[in-house]
Amino acid sequence: MPIITLPDGSQRSFDHPVSVAEVAQSIGAGLAKATLAGKVDGRLVDACDTIERDATLQIITPKDEEGLEIIRHSCAHLVGHAVKQLYPTAKMVIGPVIEEGFYYDIFFERPFTPEDMAAIQQRMRELIDKDYDVIKKMTPRAEVIELFKSRGEDYKLRLIDDMPDEKAMGLYFHEEYVDMCRGPHVPNTRFLKAFQLTKISGAYWRGDSKNEQLQRIYGTAWADKKQLAAYIQRIEEAEKRDHRRIGKQLDLFHLQEEAPGMVFWHPNGWSVYQVLEQYMRKVQRDHGYVEVRTPQVVDRILWERSGHWSNYAENMFTTASESRDYAVKPMNCPCHVQIFNQGLKSYRDLPLRLAEFGACHRNEPSGALHGIMRVRGFTQDDAHIFCTEEQVKKEAADFIKLTLQVYRDFGFTDIAMKLSTRPAKRVGSDELWDRAEGALADALNESGLAWEYQPGEGAFYGPKIEFTLKDCLGRNWQCGTLQYDPNLPERLDASYIAEDNNRKRPVMLHRAILGSFERFIGMLIEHYAGAFPAWLAPTQAVVMNITDKQADFAAEVVRILGESGFRAKSDLRNEKIGFKIREHTLLKVPYLLVIGDREVESKAVAVRTREGEDLGSMPVTQFAELLAQAVSRRGRQDSE
């Protein structure tokens, strides 16, 4: 009979097979009430599942990360229960857990409305209040098929077809509603009170736009209502920071139907863009990169040789001229290899670092477009390092150091680094993969910072390093990458003369720091809520007069600041000074300079910050020094 070993090392003996719930009850009534599931010998199981032999057991409660995932998964099933009660002809598809929530894909003859979502949420709350038990039954495959046939659940039957080796399946019964899942799930609906449905969107069966359209109901669920309230507050703050809203408020950019996924940059937004580009140009030049420019439109022959035509053609914009097919480039790498291939290269020429602010276009589905975060036309801070295998470690280490420096300059200090390693389907020998992964791992170790492996997540031809930034709302943004690639040089016949006078293939390191300028600017807008650090702000200082008598001196101050390289403008309107200050504070200008008679007389400016801090009156030259210091700090939080 089983001996159960608990996480603290204590043991409990039972004279019969025992369920997880029974073990919890033997420890205490409070734990039994909080038990969601168990982890038996490291494997998650339902609270009702029995343990028949000696095992280790961890009781899972809402406080555990696994517990939160179970709550969310069970909430997805609860969506199904409510939908089938309200809309019996709806057909249920899948309901997985996602970051901070869940969704359920549903086929229904008409689009769900916000009123439908409110009704579904209300029915879910009514079902929770019934406090019913969720019943698990392991059921033979044939019976599962018969059950879903009788209920007309066509998509469930298709999913069963995808699992030919499953002889028995877990069915979870929410009263009359039944769903199929590996589990585990909550034992009772009382655990599901802290939830909220968030939105409805479209989706496609199996994610393929050629298939029938489904409707996706999203929701979030938490261990308790306090956590849910904190999440809702965070989402509300994110909505206030939405780059689309702030972009309009600050007159940065717009998008319109005639050019879906293409950005119309206004002067203010283009100013931010130009600062980014000039900064990255200098950073890359200082680190040994040479800048190049390659064509926008390239014959399909090159894309066929690179492999992109067979794997990526549907995402490429194409055109034809004089009986030749062309594609607008979706990436820069094949073109950079063409530059490398011009002229004979020696090992003495390596490493060669080619950088390009490459304008790329990808035919993203219209439903996937999102402001300037997900677009069809974008510019990358793209570069490719051509080097020998022996140079990979140093190049990777230098790139990591540079990338972290750039992120700190933009105000991001919480950075996760991950190494994606060999997938099951890959090219190249294990020895080559060992060396490539080892070089990147050694480079990461040299940074002195924590990093983690992502096993099996590398490209089929090589490992890669990913950089993920955390913003002020705790959201993660995957930005920089360093991809090891021996494949493209082979396909495009790149070579150099090695020290032994033989031809060898270079290793190609694809790398980007910001990723796309458009997406990175969107991130900056939301991270700073539009209140850019002085070095990025479209207007760094606005000079305001109190009466017409100060207009000439205000214009003189703007001229002096402009000649010093600052972005300043005047506001000489016949409006009250309080009105002007409020307006430019809302426009998030870092410094507000007020000029009255006293300032004209002393050749000074009265300085306020957009946060409302009064810095007092100072000579124009002193303010210029203050602004120069603010600009030199960039977005750093320290005095580096």
From Swiss-Prot:
It is found in: Cytoplasm. PROSITE patterns: AA_TRNA_LIGASE_II, TGS. It is an enzyme of class 6 (ligase). One of its GO terms (biological process) is threonyl-tRNA aminoacylation. Residues 1-61 form the TGS domain. Coiled coil: none annotated. Its cofactor is Zn(2+). Zn(2+) binds at residues 333, 384, 510. Binds 1 zinc ion per subunit. It catalyses: tRNA(Thr) + L-threonine + ATP = L-threonyl-tRNA(Thr) + AMP + diphosphate + H(+). One of its GO terms (cellular component) is cytosol. Residues 242-533 are annotated as: Catalytic. The keyword Cytoplasm applies. SMART domains: tRNA_SAD (SM00863). GO terms for molecular function: ATP binding; metal ion binding; threonine-tRNA ligase activity; tRNA binding. Keywords: Aminoacyl-tRNA synthetase, ATP-binding, Cytoplasm, Ligase, Metal-binding, Nucleotide-binding, Protein biosynthesis, RNA-binding, tRNA-binding, Zinc. Belongs to the class-II aminoacyl-tRNA synthetase family. HAMAP family: Thr_tRNA_synth. Homodimer. Catalyzes the attachment of threonine to tRNA(Thr) in a two-step reaction: L-threonine is first activated by ATP to form Thr-AMP and then transferred to the acceptor end of tRNA(Thr). Also edits incorrectly charged L-seryl-tRNA(Thr). PANTHER family: THREONINE--TRNA LIGASE, CHLOROPLASTIC_MITOCHONDRIAL 2, THREONINE-TRNA LIGASE. This is Threonine--tRNA ligase.
